[in-house]
């Protein structure tokens, strides 16, 4: 605390001396005149020698050297000097660091002149006057020195005992401390600082694994070739034992990871199963590579799959977690009784019954290949003569010459085998598909016919204007003039009620609350069409035109009827001549 006070006194004394020196010199200088006369008393020529400028090779002209000195001198005004600069102090980082270094060096130099030596900041011990200041400093600056675990508050050591008998329920509980040996041992948390190079190597390894899942070959080191050869021998033995077990058991066994199986029964002596524990275990190969982060650790390999060259795939890098849950139709447990399973195609309700799995069981993969070979050329080939795009018009075109008709077959729980179905049943199923397409096509034709009507309004945007379709149909379907009383006519509406039409303010407010106003565009919807402006009188004109045409048809029919019966046609013509014709305005 004392050095700071002495420094403050020296600073004030220095300011007083500077003020006295400034009072002797003139307050302002004519710097423009100094620049015209090439005079600058602030800089001495001796200071220019400190700048080491790189001169061009060869003989240097004197004028070029002078120009270089002038450019260096002018550069001081752009932030090279503390006292003469055009930049704001603080924006020029080099200048800021220079000022800070000068401020730090000045007190040390002055103390050295006076013969006083100040200890470095690291050796200075902080002293406190009060206990509160010391505790605040310890908690804020160096909390690790005072934060210590209290053994009295270990987990399970201190308990509160409440006396619930004798009327002391509201009394303060008794504190009971257990022995430290009886308390459970607390878990110790260790903070480990990991080197950045180790983290980089782990990141590289993870990137290699990620690339390996896409089918790329992982980078192998030269010293791991011996381990790779041992892995290949283990894999070959694994394949041979697997093939032997397939031949002796007579069936292909696919083990599912998700399948829950009962405990295995004792193995019969005549069957050889895959037992890797009986094999001679290879001693682990120690890692001695300098670049390996796990130097000295043993190599603990698991039994590889059939393809050793495939890259490992971690659990979180699989395409979908549901793939493990998908059990094949032809899986069965590796041991225990064979469970009854429903095949992909259940037994048909008619035809020969297929042999059960216990009677004749062969490799189902071969059965699936045979089934696809039988279905691919034959079944679709029977319907190659159908042309669906041209047959969607009428149902009669779908029928073959030998077919009388088709019906929709009712749904059954039993799935039929296409190989065991008759031609008639196949036609029934195909006809139901065509009938469904015909219904869809009929709906599309009806919608197209409605859209040709000029008064038809599409319902594509009906969800944006709820309740508007009913309002629109009422306007279009009615022969009366539309009710324009609710149409918003704007501020210059004529015929509306105003404030002076009401006696009290309450009646005027009540009228405004009950008044309904719809936008004017809603009344004009459907009026303007593509072929010009059409009014709603078009509907009445069209009805009148239809009535006139019907009347003319009736007159022609009555005329022909009277001619056949021998009636008086002249009287009918005279009656038509007397009826006045309606003139079009």
Swiss-Prot record:
Tissue expression: Highly expressed in seedlings at 7 days after germination, young flowers before anthesis and developing siliques. Expressed at lower levels in roots, expanding leaves, open flowers, dry seeds and inflorescences. Not detected in senescing leaves.
Compartment list: Nucleus
Pfam families per the UniProt record, alphabetical: RED_C, RED_N
Consequence of gene disruption: No visible phenotype, but slower growth.
Cited InterPro entries: Red-like (IPR039896), RED_C (IPR012492), RED_N (IPR012916)
Positions of post-translational Phosphothreonine modification: 579
Biological processes per GO annotation: RNA splicing
Compositionally biased region (Basic residues): 1-14
Sequence ranges of Basic and acidic residues compositional bias: 15-39, 276-288, 530-548
Keywords assigned: Nucleus, Phosphoprotein, Repeat
GO cellular component: nuclear speck; nucleus
Ranges where the record places region Disordered: 1-52, 219-324, 523-585
Domain of life: Eukaryota
Residue spans of the R-[ED] repeats: 16-17, 29-30, 36-37, 258-259, 322-323, 436-437, 445-446, 450-451, 540-541, 542-543
Function: Auxiliary spliceosomal protein involved in splicing of specific pre-mRNAs that affect multiple aspects of development.
Protein family per UniProt: Belongs to the RED family.
UniProt subunit comment: Component of the spliceosome. Interacts with SMU1.
Protein's name according to its UniProt entry: Suppressor of mec-8 and unc-52 protein homolog 2
Organism from which the protein derives: Arabidopsis thaliana
Gene name as annotated: SMU2
